[in-house]
């Protein structure tokens, strides 16, 4: 994990601190383009590159718990224990969930986009097996035909995000891909108090594969949390295709 710190010129103790954790195949740079540039220059942003992504693309992704522990250590080394907003998209949401297990950190708001509620078991294991086969096949095709990979990414996430996402996918090792899929199929959900649950917003595109599972599990584990559905969108699609409005929405949570 490599943390990128973006601070306003006039940064004070009262400046809201925002943690933005990217999804699989994105990066800190992707979060800057999609979110930071649309949230204003008067906030303090902490934007990590997870292992196997961005400037850390040469490193093997091992686990969400390892990434969260590294983020936690980075925060404590700089005496940052209270954040205005914690944001995690897809894989980033799994890492954010792991981060919530550290009781020495607190957040005013927690925002999860397209995060997994698959927590192991027979169905999750079957899904993990299939997804590993599918993603490894797609990985081989992307390496063989990078241009086609960019085109497919563009169809899902728009022109701006397509090329870097394709490049990250091609650079990623098979083992990192398998480890990420394992984590997203076996999420260890943290125990949250009623107050912590009320700080949580879980959002999904209406076409998101993970939505059905979230609708089933969320009311049982986090009954006080908010579920929002983006009509007409797929997995993590709104944050890239409607980034100006999305960034403004996140900003309004903290200012």
Q: Can you say where each PLM-predicted feature lies in the sequence?
A:
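Conserved alpha/beta-hydrolase "acid-adjacent" motif
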Residues: 209-215
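Catalytic histidine-centered segment of alpha/beta-hydrolase-like enzymes
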Residues: 233-244
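Active-site loop/oxyanion-hole signature of alpha/beta-hydrolase fold enzymes
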Residues: 46-85
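Short beta-strand/loop motif that positions the catalytic acidic residue
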Residues: 195-196, 202-204
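Conserved HGGG/HGGXW glycine-rich cap/lid loop of the alpha/beta-hydrolase fold
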Residues: 7-57
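Gly/Ala-rich beta-loop-alpha elbow adjacent to hydrolase catalytic centers
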Residues: 87-96
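Conserved alpha/beta-hydrolase catalytic His-Asp/Glu region
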Residues: 122-123, 140-194
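Flexible "cap/lid" loop of the alpha/beta hydrolase fold
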Residues: 101, 107-138
């Amino acid at each position: 994990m490599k943390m990128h710190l973006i601070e306003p010129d006039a940064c004070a103790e009262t400046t809201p601190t925002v943690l933005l954790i990217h999804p699989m195949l994105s990066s800190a740079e992707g979060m800057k383009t999609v979110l930071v540039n649309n949230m204003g220059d008067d906030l303090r942003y902490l934007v990590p590159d997870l292992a196997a992504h961005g400037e850390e693309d040469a490193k093997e992704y091992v686990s969400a718990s390892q990434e969260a522990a590294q983020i936690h250590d980075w925060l404590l080394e700089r005496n940052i224990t209270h954040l205005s907003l914690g944001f995690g998209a897809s894989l980033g949401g799994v890492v954010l969930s792991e981060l919530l297990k550290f009781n020495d950190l607190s957040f005013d708001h927690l925002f999860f986009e397209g995060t997994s509620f698959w927590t192991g078991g027979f169905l999750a294991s079957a899904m993990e097996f299939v997804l590993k086969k599918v993603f490894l096949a797609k990985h081989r095709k992307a390496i063989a035909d990078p241009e086609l990979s960019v085109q497919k990414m563009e169809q899902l996430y728009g022109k701006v995000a397509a090329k870097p996402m394709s490049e990250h996918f091609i650079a990623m090792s098979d083992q990192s891909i398998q480890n990420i899929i394992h984590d997203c199929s076996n999420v260890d959900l943290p125990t949250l108090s009623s107050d912590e649950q009320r700080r949580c917003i879980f959002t999904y595109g209406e076409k998101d594969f993970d939505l059905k599972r979230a609708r089933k599990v969320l009311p049982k584990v986090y009954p006080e949390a908010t579920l929002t559905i983006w009509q007409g969108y797929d997995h993590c699609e709104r944050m890239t295709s409607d980034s100006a409005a999305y960034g403004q929405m996140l900003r309004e949570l903290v200012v």
